[in-house]
């Protein structure tokens, strides 16, 4: 069985070395989906309490990424931007998913559930997904 929780956040980013408009600073209304899987329900009939999943998302990526500028540590804008979240790599949707799993993914695994996948929408019709 699987359950999925979504959370939305707003952030700006740009891509160093990209030949196109995404090289300029711009923003997105991101949607992050986290899917957990397991085989056992608790005594209330839940795989995992959605409230618990939501709290983990709010304390992790939402607190770090919402209303921030996501930049590569190599970006010359770093010294000019307040409230920046710095990444080792370009802040692509794919790299953001890898960052999510590395920093917060372990917190979603319990005795009876595990993190199955994370999906990040940059726009309503463009997303990246990491299946674990």
What are these regions (language model features)?
Residues 1-132:
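Charge-rich, low-complexity N-terminal segments
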């Amino acid at each position: 069985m699987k359950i999925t929780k979504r959370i939305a956040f707003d952030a700006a980013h740009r891509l160093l070395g990209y030949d196109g408009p995404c090289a300029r600073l711009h923003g997105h209304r991101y949607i992050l989906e986290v899917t957990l899987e397991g085989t056992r329900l608790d005594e209330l009939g839940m795989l995992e309490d959605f409230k618990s999943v939501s709290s983990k998302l709010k304390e992790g990526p939402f607190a770090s990424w919402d209303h921030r500028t996501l930049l590569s540590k190599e970006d010359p804008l770093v010294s000019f931007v307040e409230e920046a979240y710095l990444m080792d790599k370009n802040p692509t949707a794919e790299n953001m998913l890898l960052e999510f799993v590395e920093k917060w993914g372990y917190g979603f695994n319990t005795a009876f559930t595990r993190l199955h996948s994370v999906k990040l929408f940059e726009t309503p019709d463009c997303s990246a997904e990491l299946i674990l």
